[in-house]
């Protein structure tokens, strides 16, 4: 793939001490080129913000503007990978390779659903979890 110039701008930058991260909106200018990969963005952000571990960087919700050449999304840089594992949703951890997805069999899903059908109200969630172990 041809390495064309890519410009990364961050705006609405804020440090969130409560969640021990930096959060911002990313604007990527990539004229004459298809979308920039998230791995490449993480690598460039790690160099920009001098992050030791690129696994602590999360980029998501990218939308390409009409006509191409510009994309916008969100970025999070956690202080440590441990804090990222603590605060990030599981699906984002799986996408970034920090967690593994548990594949449930079709039969397990159906059995759990049928157990839950027999019970009403608040006890429904407990019934699904009890037999799961």
UniProtKB/Swiss-Prot annotation:
Keyword Ribosomal protein appears in the UniProt entry: yes
PROSITE patterns documented for this protein: RIBOSOMAL_S24E
Presence of keyword Glycoprotein: no
Record's keyword terms, sorted: Ribonucleoprotein, Ribosomal protein
UniProt cross-references to SUPFAM superfamilies, sorted A to Z: Ribosomal proteins S24e, L23 and L15e (SSF54189)
Gene Ontology CC annotations of this record: chloroplast; cytosol; cytosolic ribosome; cytosolic small ribosomal subunit; nucleolus; plant-type vacuole
Compositional bias segments (type: Basic residues): 109-125
Pfam families reported in the protein's UniProt record: Ribosomal_S24e
Single Gene Ontology MF annotation: structural constituent of ribosome
A GO BP entry: translation
Top-level taxon of origin: Eukaryota
Location of the region described as Disordered in the Swiss-Prot/TrEMBL record: 104-133
Protein family: Belongs to the eukaryotic ribosomal protein eS24 family.
PANTHER family for the chain: 40S RIBOSOMAL PROTEIN S24 (PTHR10496)
Protein name per its UniProtKB record: Small ribosomal subunit protein eS24z
Organism: Arabidopsis thaliana
Lineage: Eukaryota, Viridiplantae, Streptophyta, Embryophyta, Tracheophyta
Gene label: RPS24A
């Amino acid at each position: 793939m041809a390495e064309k110039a890519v410009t990364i701008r961050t705006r609405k930058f804020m440090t969130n001490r409560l969640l021990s991260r930096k959060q911002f909106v990313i604007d990527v200018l990539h004229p004459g080129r298809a979308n920039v990969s998230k791995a490449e963005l993480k690598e460039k952000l790690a160099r920009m913000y001098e992050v030791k571990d690129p696994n602590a960087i999360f980029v998501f919700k990218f939308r390409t503007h009409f006509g191409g050449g510009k994309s916008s999304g969100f970025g999070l840089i956690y202080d440590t990978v441990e804090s990222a594992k603590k605060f990030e949703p599981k699906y984002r951890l799986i996408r970034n390779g920090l967690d593994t997805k548990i594949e449930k069999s079709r039969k397990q899903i159906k059995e759990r659903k049928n157990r839950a059908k027999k019970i009403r109200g608040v006890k429904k969630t407990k019934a699904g979890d009890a037999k799961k172990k």
